[in-house]
């Protein structure tokens, strides 16, 4: 008998909201030359084809830095840099054109066959390249002529949108022409960033050798705000890292984020399926640069009752929380604060004030099992504490059977029933024997 697994079913159920959310949106995907050289590149291209089949509008930008350096080395020609930017003289430009041209043909071919050996075999992917970008020279800096190194002068976003409307993937590289007919070498991060901004893309996606940005202990930082990302760039540059995939993408992501691109994602090109895991799961797998966190701490509304019930029911069944009916929750919803992530309630807590006695109760504290190892409980405690202070309360108490040490570590001390408000003393359940913990505000 064939073995059955529900993993596929669960994965599909979790991904469907993201499939619907992403359909019709514009994503700019930046592929550095290092990613293209890696053995996992075929899988990345296949996943890009899969995104296209789901109705996502895709602009793919490729770089060629290592390929250009390899061409120069083959001709015993030393690359020239000024302020960490390549100086593209006439000879170097020929190597740039050669590398970029070969990559364009190779990526086009791979995208064209990316849906082979899948249920979508036979579906045609139209890949379009062209002179959508007009370049201009960088010019002369400190007496150094950058020659054919350039920057973007303008982008024909209307023409690109027409191609996307027609169902094509737009593929653009590091070479663009000027109004005078000259060719210029651009950086892939500038191309990707400016395209994301001009096209009002929903996302910009880049790849690096690691799984994203990590902290000092090697843990992935799932979310960075632009100022934090800028600080990380400065730290890396101080260590001499000016041109790694991480630094180049972060520079572009900070600019894109501040210019209206909602999220920029940095992923590993070495991990198979990283693109799919990042885009179709709640927590992703890499690092996002965002202006606004995917999580929100806010007061609950009547529309949140279903999510709160789903969160607290398992804890009620285990006897950890006192059971609340939907009707009770509806009447008390204004007491609740929740943490929401991508429309899922992942944590909640309630504040019941007793203003005559200048004391409040923090109750119904619950955190989704997938997020208990993080600081969500601390976030709720801080928010409830601030609310209590704003109400003029002097003390905060909790009744708990399981989280005694957690609250004690945060300034709560054991207390007796007589410290509770009179109303609460009358309702105290001596059979449940909850521990009473009290904190001064």
From Swiss-Prot:
Coiled-coil residue windows: none
Keywords: Acyltransferase, Amino-acid biosynthesis, Arginine biosynthesis, Cytoplasm, Transferase
Pfam families: AA_kinase (PF00696), Acetyltransf_1 (PF00583)
EC top class named in words: transferase
GO terms for biological process, alphabetical: L-arginine biosynthetic process
Catalytic reaction(s) noted: L-glutamate + acetyl-CoA = N-acetyl-L-glutamate + CoA + H(+)
Pathway connected to this protein: Amino-acid biosynthesis; L-arginine biosynthesis; N(2)-acetyl-L-ornithine from L-glutamate: step 1/4
InterPro entries: AceGlu_kinase-like_sf, Acyl_CoA_acyltransferase, Asp/Glu/Uridylate_kinase, GNAT_dom, NAGS_kin, NH2A_AcTrfase
Gene Ontology MF annotations: L-glutamate N-acetyltransferase activity
Span of the signal peptide: none
Subunit details: Homohexamer.
Family per similarity comment: Belongs to the acetyltransferase family. ArgA subfamily.
Protein name, UniProt field: Amino-acid acetyltransferase
Organism of derivation: Yersinia pestis
Encoding gene, per UniProt annotation: argA
